[in-house]
């Protein structure tokens, strides 16, 4: 394995899906099977299972259940872990919080759980899909058990990128810890709205992919899920076993820019290596 890649061969790859979407529905109505037409969750489980991930899902949790689950996910047999993936499916909340049955849980608190010394060097990928709005787009829903109203209306509009600035600051503050007294400061352009100064140690090894959509609680097709999750899973299968996850994310941004330019996810990377999910003998990227 090249020194340019994290050592993941023979180690356990983990995915945690935090699905709080039903909590944002009117009167919290959900389908009779409790899944609330969530193609995203189905697609994520199927995709990551094919990539030999150990998949865990938590739905509609309280704050204490959410935090306890995440802690156990992080700390169990940590020496065997190759990488952590966390997908948050979360609607109807403020930009920097996760809706729970008893209030909200901040994303900063979630990220801070991964600052333990024992997991700092392990690559961590967070995929945050969040929507905020009164309308529910069920135009593609084909689940007979769904009790949600369908509204076919204008295309949803994404929130202005400046909403993310304070969120990113809090995220980086939570994840930033001095490592041997040394930190690196960089400036990253957050769209064309503002410049955020990011201070983070070399050892955090974190990727955050964040997309927020306003106007709709948007789930999309029950088989495909929302656009970002669908494209992420498709490209992860296509590129994740042949090159790096970084390439996968770039391809998602590329496709979103072409097909849905208002909803290109914001990506924050703080990595010293590339994350590769396939057999080391199949790496086709150029060695440095």
From Swiss-Prot:
Protein's GO biological process: proteolysis
Q: Which UniProt keywords apply?
A: Apoptosis, Hydrolase, Protease, Thiol protease
Listed Gene3D superfamilies: 3.40.50.1460
Q: Which GO terms describe its molecular function?
A: cysteine-type endopeptidase activity
Membrane-crossing residues? Answer: none
Kindly report, in one word, the top-level EC class recorded for this enzyme. Answer: hydrolase
| Active site (record annotation) | 131
* SMART domains per UniProt: CASc
* Superkingdom of source: Viruses
Signal peptide residues on this chain, from the entry's feature table: none
- EC number(s) reported in the record: 3.4.22.-
Induction description: Synthesized 9 hours after infection of cells ex vivo.
Q: Which Pfam families match?
A: Peptidase_C14
Q: Which InterPro entries match?
A: Caspase-like_dom_sf, Pept_C14_caspase, Pept_C14_p20, Pept_C14A
Q: Does the keyword Metal-binding apply?
A: no
Its function? May induce host cell apoptosis and contribute of the establishment of a special cell cleavage process in which apoppotic bodies are rescued by the virus and differentiate to form large vesicles in which virion assembles.
Q: Which family does it belong to?
A: Belongs to the peptidase C14A family.
- According to UniProt, the name of this protein is Executioner caspase
Organism of provenance:
Spodoptera frugiperda ascovirus 1a (SfAV-1a)
